Design a protein with these regions (language model features):
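C-terminal helical cap(s) of enzyme catalytic domains, especially alpha/beta-barrels
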Residues: 37, 52-62, 196-210, 252, ...
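Alpha/beta enzyme core
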Residues: 34, 39, 101-237, 243-256, ...
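Extended, intrinsically disordered, low-complexity segments
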Residues: 218, 277-312
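Active-site metal-binding loops of divalent metal-dependent hydrolases
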Residues: 22-23, 240-242
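N-terminal capping/small domains of soluble enzymes
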Residues: 1-94, 100, 275
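Flexible loop residues that form catalytic
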Residues: 22, 45, 126, 190, ...
Length: 312
């Protein structure tokens, strides 16, 4: 019998597969046995009610999807009063994703949603820091550390920092999040991108730029997971372009302890369950007794320096 359990800080998950924030909603529970997942991750919650970005919000390509949703949110009251009671009926640990405009607001929101039934908080720090220069918190090491530290002071729950790939050296941000007290890192959010309709000459998205997700992003995010795994001691959750067990295994070999599935679930609601079954089959075929033994188990050169890699 293969042991699929993985440890993410203080949380023990029955398996390493969970949804990416924003890709999982209550409607999926009617078509998917969510009790088979390792964890549940909510859509991102903000301190205020938000409608989201103007349309068009989505542009699809054969190997990726470009999004500009804008984090629509019904606010913390709706989350605490409605969503948490709903998710309590399921077995997997519940991870609440939050986003805020200031360091202080991150701490305040973390405290507000730290209610029974919530097992961890994921900090979406790819939003702009309105009190500083308007750049994303996750692009600034100092701001990243401040946000995580504020959240750790405000809640007894584990805090996961979701990093952005839109930086030069992601290990700098990974170390900053770890210094702030992050219990785990989610690597990574969507990649900033854009597209233009050549017939209308207009941008494909209402806000011009958006976040690129899907298989096309996996090699880039995989590299970032590998780098972060050699830069920090906290667990890493890989996120980007996972649609098969093979993708998840690659992330684990690169250094991830768990994996989030996002875009692929829109194409097939059962993707996460297929990935879990595939992980079990792989372990049985390759005589891997514990799936956690795959983490950071890539064979070959380790700790490749960025400057050496750039000479290809």
């Amino acid at each position: 019998m293969v042991d699929l359990r993985v440890q993410i800080g203080r949380l023990m998950l029955e398996n390493p597969i969970m949804p990416g924030s924003g890709t999982f909603g209550e409607q999926l529970t009617s078509v998917l046995d969510v009790n088979l997942l390792g964890a549940l991750v909510t859509k991102t919650i903000t301190a205020d009610i938000r409608e989201g970005n103007p349309p068009p919000r989505i542009a699809e390509f054969k190997d990726s999807v470009l999004w500009s949703i804008g984090i629509p949110s019904k606010g913390p009251v709706h989350y605490v009063d409605t969503l948490v009671p709903f998710y309590r009926q399921f077995k997997p640990p519940l991870v609440a994703s939050i986003s805020a405009d200031t360091v202080e607001q991150f701490g305040e929101l973390a405290a507000r949603i730290s209610v029974p039934g919530v097992n961890a908080i994921e900090a979406n720090i790819s939003c702009p820091n309105l009190k500083k220069d308007g750049n994303a918190f996750a692009m600034d090491p100092e701001a990243t550390e401040q946000v995580i530290r504020a959240m750790k002071s405000a809640t007894p729950l584990p805090v996961w920092a979701k990093l952005t790939p839109n930086v030069g050296d992601i290990t700098v941000l990974a170390r900053a999040a770890e210094a702030g007290g992050a219990d785990a890192l989610v690597v990574a959010n969507a990649m900033l991108a854009m597209a233009i309709d050549i017939h209308t000459r207009r941008p494909r998205l209402g806000r011009v730029m958006g976040g690129l997700t899907g298989p096309a992003t996996k090699p880039v995010i995989l590299r970032m997971v590998y780098q972060c795994a050699h830069a920090v001691q906290v667990p890493i959750i890989g996120c980007g372009g996972v649609s098969s067990a093979g993708d998840a295994i690659e992330y684990m070999l690169a250094g991830a302890s768990a994996v989030q599935v996002g875009t692929a679930s829109f194409l097939s609601a059962n993707t996460m369950l297929k990935v879990i079954d595939g992980l079990r089959d792989y372990c049985e075929t390759h005589q891997v007794a514990r799936i956690r033994d795959l983490t950071k188990a890539m064979v070959g050169p380790h700790e490749v320096r960025l400057e050496d890699a750039l000479t290809v």
